[in-house]
Swiss-Prot record:
Interacts with host HSC70. It is found in: Host cytoplasm. This is Nuclear export protein. May mediate the nuclear export of encapsidated genomic RNAs (ribonucleoproteins, RNPs). Interaction of viral NEP with M1-Hsc70 is thought to promote nuclear export of the viral encapsidated genomes. Keywords: Host cytoplasm, Host-virus interaction. The gene is Segment-7. GO terms for cellular component: host cell cytoplasm.
Length: 146
């Protein structure tokens, strides 16, 4: 993976306006579509229940992230994880990689190569939904390069 690209993305997200703030672009439609797609999935396999759960009140995005992973829609959930890769935010809303793994009942080190690199940064903070939408495009670029 191109480390320079990741540094550029981190710089862009930390210094730039959130898309839509200036009225020139908006990612809300894309996020609504993504959320609708994930919310429409049904999970009936009770054997996939995680042993540990995070408080969904603290992490409102958890429900549809978890649903995406449970239904094997890896690309949907991985775009959200990509949003966490960029940098740790000091907001106090952090979640460790291990906490997310336990909640979803997964081992991220078994995922695709770029997601394995995310495991190196075990303490991170998920970005806002609009920032995640920006990262969706970055994730597509990285996965296509590898």
């Amino acid at each position: 993976m191109n480390l320079l690209l990741l540094l550029q993305v981190a710089s862009f997200l930390s210094d730039s306006k959130v898309p839509g703030e200036d009225g020139t672009s908006s990612t809300s439609g894309m996020l609504d579509l993504l959320r609708d797609q994930v919310d429409s999935l049904s999970i009936n396999d009770s054997t996939t229940e995680p042993k540990t759960r995070l408080d969904p009140g603290l992490y409102p995005w958890l429900k549809w992230t978890e649903t995406a992973y449970r239904s094997s829609t890896r690309s949907l959930a991985s775009t959200i994880v990509m949003g966490a890769l960029v940098q740790q935010r000091g907001s106090g809303n952090g979640i460790t990689m291990r906490e997310l793994e336990l909640s979803l009942g997964l081992d991220f080190t078994s995922e695709c190569d770029w997601l394995k690199t995310c495991y190196v940064n075990k303490n991170f903070v998920f970005l806002s939904e609009k920032e995640i939408a920006v990262n969706m495009e970055v994730e597509k670029f990285i996965c296509n390069e590898n």
